[in-house]
Amino acid sequence: MKFIVKLYPEIMMKSKPVRMRFTKMLETNIRNVLKKVDEDAKVQRQWDRIWVKVPNDKPELAQAFGERLACIPGIAHVVQVDEYSFTSVDDIYQQVLPVYRDQIAGKTFCVRVKRTGSHDFNSIEVERYVGGGLNQFTDAIGVRLKNPEVTVNLEIEGDKLYMVTKRIEGLGGFPMATQEDVLSLISGGFDSGVSSYQFIKKGARTHYCFFNLGGAQHEIGVKQVAYHLWKTYGESHKVKFVSVPFEPVVAEILEKIDNGQMGVVLKRMMMRTAARIAERMGIQAIVTGESLGQVSSQTLTNLNVIDRCTDMLILRPLIAMDKQDIINECRRIGTEDFAKSMPEYCGVISQKPTVKAVLAKVEAEETKFSEDLIDRIVEQAVAIDIREIAEQMNTRITETETVVAIDTNEVVIDIRAPEEEENKPLEIEGVEIKRIPFFKLATQFADLDKQKTYLLYCERGVMSKLQALYLIEQGYHNVKVYRP
């Protein structure tokens, strides 16, 4: 069994050197991701496609491979195929017939062929021959070229016939690391998750910068969002997660800054700090989730004033998106439930915010800050490899317990993603098992029976530890981590 990875059309339009570089990078990215699923994964690059071979003795890996490929930037779509050899057009038909006889019975169908290589026939001739045979010697209703119920997709390359058994849509975009790195400001809300994802999809290695305004609970929640985005869409490359203790800045704003200017001043301080951190990391651009007119600090006038605080390029991919469109995208990429349970701290700072800030007035207000405030904040910022989030949680999860056995009055919660749970169901005789995906746990845990103890389970124990710590920070103490 094989997968044929089709390149995103924008890659195909590049010049030959650029196209080769992008394709080679995509091959490397695919290999990096799939090797974590199985060491025997084979990835081979061609001019216009990339082949992925599922080990013959491990056909069960096909679904896992397909799911991972669907989340790798730079891929238009993936087709799962079975491989056959052929000697003639009739030989092709004879091999297609037993595979599709039952599938097209009582249905309309058509045959579509894509061919590469030198042959004494063309694609249309194969479509007519195979389609005619299937129409004559099966119980199909007939051929329908437009909107058929079943499409028989065949690909021919040299003397090999590939029958397409499944088509998986890809992310599109460019392969990771074909663009320069960016530093994304992430709060855990709807907007910042989507803006981060859009730059991952565009091929930029996206590092995360979090301004902590709400203590450990806020940081844990944001780390879950960042880890989810990286693990799902950007796992092929290492990135950094930078946590900035921003409470001192907020304290000085509340104490010293005019109420109407607070929101704009806060954003300017964030941009200054992020720019300093980005420069240290060799990054040339900051990404934010700001959308025009969404809140008072996001008017054109205020955004202009905010941008004047630094020479660093500030990118706003959501600038013209409606809020509902952002939420819909948030739901699609799997960060909606995180965002729903994430507290919002920035919105309470200014009671009567200005929508037309004057640069001179803002700069005058900023002279009230302690001279070394930004320097102190930058020095206190902590940057970690995002892969270390799980290890870091291990050192902070002393308040909870990891268990291997299950006692009475304990319920196991399988927090894996639905498709992962379906592929490998957790079954424990005599034990109640609830299935609540990790991204819904924060919003649904409060509805559970508080008299019971809940054991969180996931395959590797990473997300279960993050979720346990998050729930403990929220005041729940009837939670443990289950590691059988």
UniProtKB/Swiss-Prot annotation:
GO terms for cellular component: cytosol. SMART domains: THUMP. The active site is at residue 458. It catalyses: [ThiI sulfur-carrier protein]-S-sulfanyl-L-cysteine + a uridine in tRNA + 2 reduced [2Fe-2S]-[ferredoxin] + ATP + H(+) = [ThiI sulfur-carrier protein]-L-cysteine + a 4-thiouridine in tRNA + 2 oxidized [2Fe-2S]-[ferredoxin] + AMP + diphosphate; [ThiS sulfur-carrier protein]-C-terminal Gly-Gly-AMP + S-sulfanyl-L-cysteinyl-[cysteine desulfurase] + AH2 = [ThiS sulfur-carrier protein]-C-terminal-Gly-aminoethanethioate + L-cysteinyl-[cysteine desulfurase] + A + AMP + 2 H(+). Residues 406-484 form the Rhodanese domain. Residues 63-167 form the THUMP domain. Its EC number is 2.8.1.4. It is found in: Cytoplasm. Signal peptide: none annotated. ATP binds at residues 185-186, 267, 289, 298. It holds the Pfam family ThiI. GO terms for molecular function: ATP binding; CCA tRNA nucleotidyltransferase activity; tRNA binding; tRNA-uracil-4 sulfurtransferase activity. Its main location: cytoplasm. HAMAP family: ThiI. Catalyzes the ATP-dependent transfer of a sulfur to tRNA to produce 4-thiouridine in position 8 of tRNAs, which functions as a near-UV photosensor. Also catalyzes the transfer of sulfur to the sulfur carrier protein ThiS, forming ThiS-thiocarboxylate. This is a step in the synthesis of thiazole, in the thiamine biosynthesis pathway. The sulfur is donated as persulfide by IscS. This is tRNA sulfurtransferase.
